[in-house]
Regions:
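Nucleotide/phosphate-binding site architecture used for ATP/NTP-dependent chemistry
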Residues: 2-476, 505-658
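Conserved catalytic-core segments centered on acid/base and nucleophilic motifs
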Residues: 470-506, 513-514
Length: 658
């Protein structure tokens, strides 16, 4: 390697979004503003890390084939603490990227961390990467065909995501500066452990460059409405004329269900409106305050003027969940979790609520509950679902097709059962995303604390053996629900870290796994129909129904194995000095899966319902040497949010003697 390199210092400058956020913080809290300024590169680096990791694994612009590992001592002029560095060539741009490697993991994942450096191959000048858009610029030089409206938008997304990453981590540094306990202890001792766990996930999606995307919100709105800032939100109650709505409910009719969910609400509304107001002509909808201010009074003004949509004065006190548009009451309140439409660009999509979500949620709940009740295979596993009990969306049959869909999706409400109605008092409920979180003043993630607690309770000799037992218990519950559903019934739950709630016992082990949110699942329509469940009553625009067995398998595998278990196992392995621990934990997951498939074969013989060839086909795909990996950055640049792109990666579940 040519060591005649010149390091060039650069002046750090705020971009427009960072400047606006900084000015907001100066007015709001000068200490926070100073921390924001100090952490600006750290926030940007976290987004750069996601971009580089994904482009490498996806082999975007040959970032993987044109990369190699080098020793950090070959770049002694740089202050790099890791032993190895990932070097990625951009031959057309004549640039070389250097990314410090912190670990290598399953599914061909190389973990890296900032600061990152770029070398000009002509001048041999090295500079620190100041923003992820510098990397995007080189990607587009290598692949000019990707320079289009989608990449222009992605560039803005990276600016927004990096700004909000710094916004979030600087708030955490400010608000938790007097804490030092492990994060799990803080969550466990909170008045509402579940809500606190949602608020503890500061950095968002661990792999997506748009992890902190909040396009459509200014700094004040981001502060008011994002989970990490812990702010109470007053949800708006809207009365919508029944001729402008479509509803669905799990058991009783929509109005009765809503009255049961909010027993005091009707009385409060009756006190607000005149005695001769006819409530029977209207239905209750909950609307996010941002959606009310920015969308309802512009796109639905005609209906408001005609008193077909009426805003009530009464509000509901809720808090944002990690997903932004899912709102949660604070314990001891037992009112439902609510999923709402928001025209805000979050991660990779604008998060309105599709008609099929509010319509199909209760229908899907009914089918799943019937399966779980009647099929004995599920009784062996400590897992279940969270009911979606009722949904409503705006619908004006006079609107033309695309306009009708747009307006329907902008006003929708889905009610989900409150987790505290389902769990015993002595367990701690958490969103699994929080299991891998940390904060600046204690880097022990909750999953590590739980394993240490289990090690102590079970009097086990070492962390590694405790971790293996912990992973076995956890994966058995998670996979014991997901795998039989996709294999026997063709239902692929999207059981990633954010779409689950896990409860933990005092000894640190999982008690029960709860899977929620049926918007993104996929159903092999023919398979579910063959098992005796009709889909004729599903919404006519349903995207969840498919004829593609590959799409169904990938949905279940990516969300459950790659995302959910993959992140947990990676985090555990980083807490150990045993370089073989990660591999051994994947062996355990494979054993759990083998056992589930064995049980499926037995249940098939008893009920004579599932062709054994189907089980073998799924096993062959799941245990193949290479497995599909979803290319989140490639999809974003190609503007294919709903058409997934995959690349083959090494599969940790593969064994030579399958």
């Amino acid at each position: 390697m040519n060591l005649n390199l010149i390091f060039k210092e650069q002046t750090l400058k705020f971009n427009k979004e960072e400047q606006e956020t900084y000015l907001f913080l100066q007015q709001h809290n000068s200490d926070w503003a100073n921390i924001f300024k100090e952490m600006i590169l750290q926030g940007r680096d976290k987004v750069t890390q996601r971009l580089v990791t994904s482009m490498h694994r996806e082999n975007l612009v040959k970032a993987r084939t044109q990369s190699k590992k080098i020793l950090s001592r070959d770049l002694i002029m740089l202050d790099i603490s890791t032993t190895h560095i990932l070097e990625i060539q951009f031959p057309q741009a004549k640039q070389t990227l250097y990314a410090p490697i912190t670990g290598e993991h399953a599914f061909d994942r190389i973990d890296i961390e900032g600061p990152f450096y770029i070398k000009d191959d002509i001048t041999n000048t090295i500079t620190r990467v100041h923003h992820p858009n510098e990397i995007l610029e080189y990607i587009l030089i290598e692949a000019p065909d990707l320079k289009n409206a989608a990449s222009d938008q992605f560039q803005q997304d990276l600016i927004n995501s990096a700004t909000n990453m710094t916004f979030a981590i600087s708030y955490q540094a400010l608000s938790m500066q007097h804490d030092s306990a492990p994060l799990f202890n803080i969550i466990e001792n909170s008045e509402d452990s579940y809500l606190r766990s949602e608020q503890a996930v500061i950095e968002g999606h661990p792999l997506h460059p748009g992890a902190k995307l909040r396009k459509g919100l200014n700094a004040l709105q981001t502060f008011l409405y994002s989970s990490e800032f812990n702010q109470p939100i007053k949800l708006k109650i809207v009365l919508i004329h029944s001729k402008l709505s479509r509803t669905m409910s799990l058991s009783k009719d929509y109005d009765t269900t809503v009255h049961q969910l909010f027993p005091d609400l009707i009385k409060q509304l009756e006190n607000e409106f005149t005695p001769n107001f006819n409530f029977n002509d209207y239905q209750i909808m909950i609307v996010h305050p941002w959606q009310l201010d920015d969308v309802l009074y512009s796109d639905y003004q005609a209906e408001v003027d005609k008193k077909l949509i009426i805003e009530a004065k009464h509000t509901l006190d809720y808090y944002a969940g990690l997903s932004f548009r899912t709102l949660i009451p604070k314990y001891p309140a037992m009112s439902p979790h609510i999923k709402l439409s928001t025209n805000v660009h979050i991660t990779g999509e604008i998060r309105t609520l599709s008609e099929q979500t509010t319509h199909n949620g209760p229908l899907m709940t009914r089918i799943l509950n019937d399966i779980l009740k009647k099929d004995g295979i599920f009784k062996s596993y400590a897992s279940t679902i969270i009911d979606e009990v009722a949904g409503i969306h705006f619908y004006n049959e006079q609107d033309e097709a695309d306009y009708q869909t747009e307006r329907s999706e902008q006003l929708g409400t889905l009610f989900r059962k409150n987790i505290y109605q389902m769990i015993p008092q002595e367990v701690t409920p958490m969103i699994p995303s929080s299991l891998v979180a940390t904060y600046p003043f204690n880097n022990e993630s909750p999953i590590v604390t739980l394993i240490k607690r289990y090690q102590s309770a079970a009097s086990l000799s070492d962390f590694e053996s405790s971790a293996k037992s912990w992973v076995e218990t956890y994966s058995k519950a998670l996979l014991g629900l997901v795998i039989p559903l996709v294999t026997k019934y063709g239902i692929a739950l999207e059981a990633h870290l954010q779409n689950a709630i896990a409860t933990f016992r005092k000894d640190g082990l999982l008690d029960t796994m709860y899977i929620r949110d049926f918007e993104g699942l996929r159903i092999d329509k023919a398979q579910l129909n063959e098992m005796g469940y009709s889909t004729s009553h599903f919404h006519e625009k349903s995207r969840i129904l498919t004829d593609s067995k590959t799409s169904v398998f990938n949905k279940a595998f990516y969300s459950t194995v790659q995302n959910h278990l993959g992140e947990l196992i990676l985090t555990i392995s980083k807490a150990s000095n045993d370089s073989n621990l990660e591999r051994h934990m994947w062996y355990i997951v494979r054993d759990v899966l083998d056992n589930i498939f064995d049980q499926l074969v037995l249940s098939t013989h008893k009920s004579n319902q599932v062709n054994e060839n189907r089980i073998n086909e799924i096993k062959d795909t799941m245990f193949a040497p290479f497995i599909d990996y979803k290319c989140v950055t490639t999809m974003r640049l190609e503007d294919e949010a709903h058409h997934y792109t995959y690349i083959k990666v090494n599969n940790p579940l593969y064994r030579e003697n399958n």
